[in-house]
Amino acid sequence: MKIVLTTVQAPFVKGGAEFLAQNLNNALIKQGHESEIVSIPFMDSPLDLIEDHIVAARLFDLTNSWAGKIDLCIGLKFPAYYIPHPNKVVWALHQHRGAYDLFDTEYSNLKNDVVGNDIRKIVINADNKYLHEAKRIYTIADNVTKRMEKYNNIKSTPLYHPCPDMEKFYEGDNEDYILMPSRINITKRQLLAIEAMLYSKTKTKLYVMGKSDTEYERDRMLDFIKEKKLKDKIKYFDSVSQEEKFQLYAHAKAILFIPLDEDYGYITLEAMAASKAIITAKDSGGPLEFVIDGKNGLIVDSTPQEIAKAFDEFATSEMMCKKMGKDSKEHLIDMEITWDKVVKELTR
């Protein structure tokens, strides 16, 4: 089949969504399909652009190309999953969360005012109207499925996929640090983790790894570390190679991943692939679909004090690190998350 994957792109920004699209594209080609990624630009600031992008998505026609008829369209991201096609399935990474669970919070530029409520209504109405055009609706995680049902009363099916380079992660000898990988972003809550180090009673270090979405967020984090006099407790890795990333995972005592209501979270799967236990929070969303409290990680309240307690538990017990790390890898194997399964379901 000739298949197009519709998604959005913010120039010079690359994260989990871009990796997913590329890996799905590769998996489809490996299965003998002709597949292309079709990206449209997207910005949600100024707010008027949101409605403009919705309208633009509806004006595209992907029924045919110069290479002939397009057999299947797989919609991945808002508002690209609105692009019309007679044979479309949606595999939603997430909806425009600023209009839903993040509305009128510090994590969204949509506020409870006239403009914010108008744009929110436009987004919700568009989802209610256009998502139903798809023959089947999938999401990348049960957390996304539950949100879609809660806010739109739209049924969908969770479909898990492997993280990039999952087979390349490995287990090494533990060194005296706990790793917090993620791009530097307010929803990933690095500042909360840094604050937790004020309450840690061990000498174990926190390694923070990830590029920042903006210079402002990076500088704010570094200033916070300096202000709290935590330079001896925290080490920051801005840009690392893939090999360096694998090494940092391999030698960590555990992985700290405490995002706010994450959709899916590659970090969790990466930790499991590297035979590492995960510290996550009760409001972290996606990771809770993989972490079993007390078996392959710890699920704690999202307070600096509780995070510090979990941090210190792993810091002081090598046996706990090894046992939970082993259980983590076994749990991942048991879940049988493969691209072959994803392709089979999306193209059936």
In which residue ranges do the predicted regions lie?
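Conserved donor-binding/catalytic core segment of Leloir-type glycosyltransferases
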Residues: 170-188, 194-201, 206-208
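Aromatic "clamp/platform" in nucleotide-sugar-dependent glycosyltransferases that forms part
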Residues: 260
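Membrane-proximal helix-turn-helix segments that form the acceptor-binding/catalytic region
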Residues: 108, 113-137, 145
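Short hydrophobic beta-strand element within catalytic cores of glycosyltransferases
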Residues: 277-281
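Glycosyltransferase donor-sugar binding loop
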Residues: 205-222
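A short, well-ordered alpha-helix in the C-terminal region of glycosyltransferases
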Residues: 306, 313, 320-335, 341
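Conserved acidic donor-binding segment of nucleotide-sugar-dependent glycosyltransferases
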Residues: 293-294, 298-305, 313-318
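Nucleotide-activated donor-binding/catalytic signature segment of Leloir-type glycosyltransferases, i.e.
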Residues: 218-240
